[in-house]
Amino acid sequence: MSRRIKKLNQLFRADISALLQKEIRDPRLDTLLSVNEVDISEDMRHANVYVSHLAGDEHKDEILAALNAAAGFFRTEIAKKTDIRYMPVFHFVWDITIERGVRLNTLIDQVIHHQPED
């Protein structure tokens, strides 16, 4: 991944987070929503935006529907203040890395506690 794409990933992550905090008025998108990562494709036409909710994935489908419906708004607002040739289309994806990490830690703890002592 090029240095430019890495910088844009960080910039878009910060911008989308700020827009979620200050501009979006959708009740499905509350302050417990977290933008974990942005991954722009090499041709810079698409970007996966990985999000999670601190309360878990109970309303995952509603949240993703609201975010993907607002993807054009995010793209337009970020394009206004960013000078790049191609503004990627944002695709919001549920980030399972935190849940996977918690599950892995639980499994490790179970193995440690069930080992016979020498």
UniProtKB/Swiss-Prot annotation:
The keyword Cytoplasm applies. The keyword Nucleus does not apply. GO terms for biological process: maturation of SSU-rRNA. InterPro entries: KH_dom-like_a/b, RbfA, RbfA_dom_sf, Ribosome-bd_factorA_CS. GO terms for cellular component: cytosol. PROSITE patterns: RBFA. Monomer. Binds 30S ribosomal subunits, but not 50S ribosomal subunits or 70S ribosomes. One of several proteins that assist in the late maturation steps of the functional core of the 30S ribosomal subunit. Associates with free 30S ribosomal subunits (but not with 30S subunits that are part of 70S ribosomes or polysomes). Required for efficient processing of 16S rRNA. May interact with the 5'-terminal helix region of 16S rRNA. Its main location: cytoplasm. It comes from the Bacteria. NCBIfam families: rbfA. It holds the Pfam family RBFA. This is Ribosome-binding factor A. Keywords: Cytoplasm, Ribosome biogenesis. It is found in: Cytoplasm.
